[in-house]
Amino acid sequence: MTFLIAAAGTGGHVYPGLAVGEALVDSGVRKDEVLFVGGDRLEATVYPEAGFPFLQTVLRGLSRSPSLETLTLPAVIWKARSTILEEIRRRGTRVALGLGGYVTVPTGMSCSRAGIPLMLAEQNAGAGLANRVASRWAQRTFVSFPNTMGLGTGEWVGNPVRKPLASFDRETLRAEAHARYSLDSSFPVLAVFGGSLGAGAINEAVASMAQSWAGSTFQIVHLTGRRHIDDLADLEASDHLTWRRIGFEDRMDLFYAAADLVVARSGGGVAELTATGSPSILIPGDFGSSGHQEANAAFLETSGAALVLSQADVGSLGSVVGDTLFDSSSLMKMREAALAISRPRAADTIASAMREAIS
């Protein structure tokens, strides 16, 4: 028996896919029985480094508006479909999972032609275009929010997170996290994360705050993204705070363990915030699937787990941080609210469903 997981593009698709693959292995499936499919972006590095077989196809995203590229898109999708279908038949693949992004559509077409079950996992409160298209071929759909829009009835299981976050224990990790970032346990910590690609607008707002801060002392652990680290490396922080800048972090459990409050985008990665019980200030991005980051942020805000700051108001970040980071009562309520809506075992649930489909 073999399994196929199609997830490509940004970390919001890639890492949930990896979490499901690792959950399959934990359940007794061999790594060589789990085939990952994607393109040439983040997935082309992450999956092979994790020890999984990887099929790379030539792909590009689905355009939402007419263009010259739109005219050639059917041929690109059809070629990817043929490549994936050939591999499904060669390996004897029995079930597939698509996690959105451009690879999901040709995967769905391949599953339909091969006659094997397709499952979908949607990371956002508003389904992306690829998952909406692929839903016509899906037997089961798993969603990360209770009222996900665009996919009809889905099973609310949460968004898969990797084992270190699914079994997260802040108190156990706290001392190690402080040591990793050379932090002083006497002062609160603001952790900043712009996603797998970083976030330029958030980085600029944090840099402005760090250089001009004149309030109570605190510390910043700033995950800038590799493409932005050089832009910020030489800037000096105010005397009232410590500012640690990091391009990439492979121990996100320690990143969240260090944090008293997190500033982040509100893509599918909000599942990590809820799994770790991290109070947050969310700044929805105006890219990707239409309005999905706003919808994700609104759910956490309504649940009491986060505050939401619009992109247009990002200049007021310092004021919001000052009002929140030193309010231990509010932080505790936000932490409890985040944990209340978390579904940290999503990867295990989806892996179990995939195994059941071929039993």
Stretches with model-predicted labels:
Residues 3-8, 30-76, 157, 228, ...:
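Conserved nucleotide-sugar phosphate-binding/catalytic loop shared by glycosyltransferases and other
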Residues 66-95:
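An amphipathic, basic-hydrophobic alpha-helix
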Residues 343-359:
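C-terminal alpha-helical cap of glycosyltransferases
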